[in-house]
Structure formats: C-alpha cells, structure tokens
Amino acid sequence: EKQSAENGEEVKVLRFSAIPDEDTTAQKERFQPVADYLSKALGIDVEFVPSINYGASVEKFENNDVQLAWFGGVTGVQAMSRVEGARALVAGQKDLAFKSYFIANVSTGLEASEDFPAAIADLKFTYGSSSSTSGCIMPSHFIIENTGKTPMEFFKEKPGFSGAHDKTAMLVQDGSFQAGALSFGTYEKLVAAGKVDPEKCVKIWETPTYADYNMTAHPDLENTFGEGFLDKLQQALVDCQDEAALKALGREKLVKVNNETFSGIAAVMEKVKFD
C-alpha cells in the first residue's frame, strides 16, 4: 500500500499481520522482529498490524489492509480462496508435519494412549479458535475419521471455544474444561516453561500429521513493489537466519511451499461443520 509523504512522494509500505494463536495481547511485541528482518532484507518499509482474532486476519488480507500474513492452514486456505492470486510462500519445516494433542484434566482418569480417546464424548471439551487448524478443524477431522460422527453428534455437551491454544491448556489444567485439543508446539512450550504441569494437564492422544502454518502474500504487492517481488519476498523468508524473527514465528527454518501444499486442509474444511 502507498502512503503520501510530506514532500508529496508516495511511501510504499508492506503491512504484515498474523493469527493471534497465543498470548493475544502481546502480538506487536512478538512479531516486530519479523517486520524488522523483512524491512532490512528487502530495503522497504514493513509494518506489523495486530489482528484481534483469526477471522480479522483474513478480513484484513481480503481487504488489502495487510499484504502478508502468518496464517494457520485453515486461515491460509480462506485467504487464498477469497483473494485471487494470493500465494502461500513459506512454512516452517515443522509445519509440513504438524499435529494436535488431545489433553485431559487428571481428574478424568484418562491416560496417554495410541488409540483415539472415545471417552471424551462424555466430557466438557474445548477447542481453541473455531478457525484454528490444529486447535479445531483437524481435531474435528480426526473425531469424524475415528467415530463416524461430527463433533456436534459426538460430544454429549456442546464443545467450547477458548480462542487460543494457551487458553485451552490453562482451562483444562484448572478444570474449567475436562478435555481439549491444541497445537502440539504450544503444549510442549508451556510444559517446558513450567506453566503447564503434564501430570495435571495430561496429553492423552496425538493426531497423525498434516500441513499447517504458512506465510501467504497478497498479489497487490507486485503492483506496489514491482513484478517478481513475491519471489524476492519468498527468498528473503527462506534465507532468514535472524534468531529473533524465527523465534517470533516459533520456527527454526522456513521452507518454500505453494498453494497446493494446503489442498488437504481445504478438503477437510468442506467436511467439518459446526452447524
């Protein structure tokens, strides 16, 4: 997008956002290093714009209020379907084999198993955001795959939506909900930080792997910064060795992907309904 400078010249700015998947109040602080890295690597102005929820990040992208976003699999597919020419550029190495954990409060008596935990049907269960790949859509897919029932048929009590992965873990740990599903990475990070006690908030099942997070770019960037800019942006992300930027994304390395990488998620989204 272009802004007018005081001298009348247009200042070109790349605006970047992200899904607020955890610690929703500290987004700008978290993602600023990514904006700083891209600004330096590409020699342009890059500004981080927070999103209040998952849906808002997709709306901003659709309206061209942001031209680059760190999406989950589901939000990425939504953005690609709404903006013709939108391109998934990179994912973390681990995003090509992402997984969800099903967790339960110790009081349920449920323990880790390789078998799908069918007993959660009777429990008070929470997802993360309804647009979360690892916190809702893929867990629901595996419920359907293992039981032949939609989540609304499977759970005796309507499931809750915490809005973010860390909130899911805390709500299950404190007993507000008896069980839940979340990103494996967030659970492991919270355990490592001592915020989640795995004896109280027990990992009971891990899903098979799927493709998830991605950095997706708006086609209008080529109008603003010139033809071939998306390739340059992709390369700058793949080349990123900036520790602060990679830490912000929770990734050790970024790898090239394309829209096809997420076709499996698109197919799952057609099947998972909460109506």
For the regions a protein language model found, what residue spans apply to each?
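General small-molecule cofactor/ligand-binding pocket signal
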Residues: E47-V49, K158-G160, V202-W205
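Periplasmic-binding protein-like
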Residues: I19-P20, G92-Y101, K195-L237, K247-G264
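Bilobed "Venus flytrap"/periplasmic-binding protein-like clamshell domains
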Residues: V11-S39, S51, A97-M170, D174, ...
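A ligand-binding cleft/hinge motif common to bilobed small-molecule-binding domains
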Residues: W70-V83, I144-E145, L171-P198
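Stable alpha-helical elements in mature extracytoplasmic
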Residues: R30, V34, N53, S57, ...
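N-terminal hydrophobic or amphipathic helices and topogenic motifs
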Residues: E1-A56, A245-D275
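Ligand-binding clefts/hinges and TM-proximal coupling segments of bilobed small-molecule sensing domains
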Residues: K124-E145, D231-D275
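Acidic, polar ligand-binding/catalytic clefts
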Residues: E59-A119
